């Protein structure tokens, strides 16, 4: 903060109040989070690409990828992100998991794809196939059991045929939003 009054009388005055500065851990930067293969029995790892600024992860072919994200899930936990796909696969999705094992209690959401998945929530399978980004907000705390999650999983499943599915995730954030205004509770002046 600066108060500058360079004229002869130098009578400038400023008041600053209720200022908080903190590191925001709710954004997922793929350049600083190791992107690993998820569950060796699922997918062949596929191919990944991370943008230089770390904001975007592309998973192609037949990939289930994971980043470590220790987070305490509460009923108000939300995940928001931009999603697009230019190559339709069988299953495109996102999940929160505690142990890197498929079908062992993870909370998984379908976003797009030709295959139905009875182990996934399909309420957010709304992507229109345009190849353009669409913003998605999922109130995961309403679906997941409260408790600790350790991983965020990014899915482009396409293990039949061409194996060329594509999922692109950008601007991924995980945070608590008690009052539903899509502002991280740690930053919300209303709380």
Q: Residues of each region from the PLM?
A:
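Extracellular beta-strand ligand-recognition surfaces/modules
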Residues: 1-13, 19, 81, 92-96, ...
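Secreted extracellular polysaccharide-interacting domains
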Residues: 3, 57-78, 88-94, 99-124
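Short, tryptophan-glycine- and acidic/Ser/Thr-enriched carbohydrate-recognition patches
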Residues: 26-43
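Short carbohydrate-recognition loop motifs
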Residues: 42-64
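Solvent-exposed loop and beta-edge segments used for protein-protein assembly and interaction
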Residues: 72-75, 86-88, 130-132, 146
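Extracellular calcium-associated, cysteine-rich motifs in secreted modular proteins
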Residues: 177-191
């Amino acid at each position: 903060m600066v108060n500058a009054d360079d004229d002869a009388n130098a009578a400038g005055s400023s008041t600053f109040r209720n200022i908080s500065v903190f590191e925001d851990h709710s954004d997922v930067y793929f350049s600083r989070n190791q992107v690993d293969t998820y569950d060796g029995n699922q997918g062949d790892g596929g191919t990944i690409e991370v943008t230089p600024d770390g904001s975007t992860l592309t998973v192609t072919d037949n990939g289930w990828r994971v980043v470590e994200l220790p987070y305490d899930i509460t009923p108000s936990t939300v995940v928001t992100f931009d999603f697009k796909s230019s190559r339709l696969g069988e299953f495109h999705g996102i999940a929160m998991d505690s142990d890197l094992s498929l079908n062992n209690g993870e909370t998984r959401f379908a976003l797009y794809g030709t295959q139905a998945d009875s182990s996934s929530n399909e309420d957010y399978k709304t992507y229109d196939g345009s190849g353009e980004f669409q913003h998605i907000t999922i109130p995961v705390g309403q679906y997941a059991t409260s408790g600790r999650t350790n991983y965020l999983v990014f899915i482009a499943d396409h293990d039949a045929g061409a194996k060329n599915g594509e999922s692109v995730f950008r601007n991924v954030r995980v945070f608590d939003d008690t009052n539903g205004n899509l502002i991280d509770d740690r930053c919300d002046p209303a709380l």
